[in-house]
């Protein structure tokens, strides 16, 4: 019979003012083999985030995407880390994200078992097979420096490890079928997906960049690289310090995006800014550019689809972030990002603008206008055309003034 701990009460606006995160203790005896936690509340009226720490630290996060989770030595609900259940006091984290004026009642039940197999997560779907030969689009040949090539990718995607609908394998197969060379898997406030990435990447022939979208009510940031878990409860400057110290890169994600715009103060400046995101709904708007240039014109602009699920989102690679790399693999992509060898296009097969030495090269952009910080510079007449280089950000615009491609 599992050992059961129950907590119940009412979260109010006063609780949210006191702290965004609250902790409900669960005692885990030595020899425990399974933990299962369930949270009940009126989901039509409120949004409560769910996560967990053990005596040794972080064990998982699912935000508002799940009502329950389970952890066992050899398996865990996506978003959570399998492994030994350390004896001692565990803490279930409740994030108060959204409340009605009168608050919301909640009931939390935690079960702990010492019987192997009694409390286990639901089984995961069988992985899809790799794409058959010929179903993957051929690589796009863009002009690059000797020994390098431009890789097409997406720096912002989600899976079932947070609030996405696809497994890591399903996302990888889908992205490979779209012709992408790399994808950063950036699930919210968790790194439980990282352990899957190398094997899935090898199976589907795509580079999978470890990532975490550090997610708070004041803004989201993409921590890229094998940097471990970044504690979203700490100030944003600590995210930058931890990511850089561990060899990764931090991006301010969708800084102008409705209620998830960036409002967090920082002394430092992350090296990347997600200038192009699906929330750039009208590509004639210049607000994302204005924010980037006011925040830090030296930051490298990148793009991300923020992919979650088929049927409701633009597909991965919308926009496409191009990175000039000396090799395949996560380290090469990070090196290219760090060096600023980046360009963004609205889609993988769309117009691209590349900086090459003292030149700007427009590819597949006939009819577009090359525009610099001071205004229009030239009309593109040919499928591949070079122009004198110039300082500052450069864009390709269509005749309506919509951005087609962007580079620094």
Where are these regions (language model features)?
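Surface-exposed beta-strand/loop patches in noncatalytic accessory domains
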Residues: 3-17, 40-77, 87, 121
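Exposed aromatic-hydrophobic patches
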Residues: 23-27, 79-81, 380-390
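Noncatalytic modules at the cell exterior or secretory-pathway interfaces
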Residues: 31-39, 81-105, 390-395
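Solvent-exposed, flexible loop/coil segments flanking beta-strands in beta-rich domains
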Residues: 1-40, 112-118, 124, 141-144
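Short beta-strand elements
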Residues: 110-111, 125-130, 401-408
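Charged catalytic cores and adjacent phosphate/nucleic-acid-binding surfaces used
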Residues: 136-146, 217-229, 259-408
